[in-house]
């Protein structure tokens, strides 16, 4: 990782890993330091403890239980959704800020990511038409009921970029390890909604906030939002 962007990437990953470590000590390698090479003054690094890892996937019950514990115990310092620094999805910056509601956070950050995607790939009338309906109708329908009519959700610390490439097993302890974090305080359902949250529900480690019937729509909205930084960094939707 190079230059100013590389500096921001390693420093935000260090803060993400450090924040997770404070809540779930055994779930991540200990983050030790980040900085710049003395002899390569434009090259950045992040240093974590060595953990002997295997590429096996974790147990379907044990891993969701540990992630659900992270979500329960990782509380936002100001009660809001967001994160104090910009994190990165690959090379794409995610400018979180702080927001009072999950709908507000999701809408604002997704709009910025869509704009970045369009700048990277060029304007696309079909996507722009879709995005108008996405923000006016699709997003409010499953998200707004979470925080209306007396309902509320608590911002939870999440890994932020969880997929099988960022999960391993400790060869010595047999326990799951997660790394390459890009954390923020979110609605916990958005932590890989199609995989981890369903595992957690099946294992009885977390519960689906009412209205439960909208859970699939919320998962789909999160999946759509996650496709924008992928497209901005790579080859299009």
Descriptions of predicted regions:
Residues 1-104, 108:
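ATP-binding pocket architecture of kinase catalytic cores
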Residues 11, 129, 133, 200-203:
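Conserved phosphate-coordination/catalytic loops
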Residues 15-18, 140, 209:
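Short, well-ordered amphipathic alpha-helices
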Residues 36-39, 75-159, 170-173:
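An alpha-helical support segment within catalytic cores of ATP-dependent transferases
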Residues 59, 124-127, 216:
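Residue-level recognition of alpha-helical structural elements
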Residues 98, 102-104, 111, 115-116, ...:
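Active-site Asp-x-Gly
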Residues 221-230:
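Hydrophobic alpha-helical segments that form the core
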Residues 233-237:
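ATP/Mg2+ or Mg2+-diphosphate-binding catalytic cores
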